[in-house]
From Swiss-Prot:
Primary role: Plays a role in pre-mRNA splicing as a core component of the spliceosomal U1, U2, U4 and U5 small nuclear ribonucleoproteins (snRNPs), the building blocks of the spliceosome. Component of both the pre-catalytic spliceosome B complex and activated spliceosome C complexes. As a component of the minor spliceosome, involved in the splicing of U12-type introns in pre-mRNAs. As part of the U7 snRNP it is involved in histone 3'-end processing.
SMART domains in alphabetical order: Sm
Keywords annotated in UniProt: Cytoplasm, Disease variant, Hypotrichosis, mRNA processing, mRNA splicing, Nucleus, Ribonucleoprotein, RNA-binding, Spliceosome
Main location: cytoplasm
UniProt family annotation: Belongs to the snRNP Sm proteins family.
GO cellular component: catalytic step 2 spliceosome; cytosol; methylosome; nucleoplasm; nucleus; pICln-Sm protein complex; precatalytic spliceosome; small nuclear ribonucleoprotein complex
Protein name: Small nuclear ribonucleoprotein E
Domain of life: Eukaryota
Native species: Homo sapiens
Length: 92
């Protein structure tokens, strides 16, 4: 355990991945998904549902090609968890 100054304890709390995804869902955060073995393409959208396999339902999804910076509107999609490498929140 880490300590700070006058004997005050600093407690580190582990965050479960499912809790982070749930927070993105609750806050209606726009997220960017990095895809497995698709380094030049990313998906952005708002999580409106997910399951224990990390399958995501995204609303207002866009396919983003990083080399050409082009965007393709996809609408509402279901993205299988097997395709997900990283999730990050993006500002609108």
């Amino acid at each position: 355990m880490a300590y700070r100054g006058q004997g005050q304890k600093v407690q580190k709390v582990m965050v479960q991945p499912i809790n982070l995804i749930f927070r993105y869902l609750q806050n209606r955060s726009r997220i960017q998904v990095w895809l497995y073995e698709q380094v030049n393409m990313r998906i952005e959208g708002c999580i409106i549902g997910f399951d224990e396999y990390m399958n995501l339902v995204l609303d207002d999804a866009e396919e983003i090609h990083s080399k050409t910076k082009s965007r393709k509107q996809l609408g509402r999609i279901m993205l299988k968890g097997d395709n997900i490498t990283l999730l990050q929140s993006v500002s609108n």
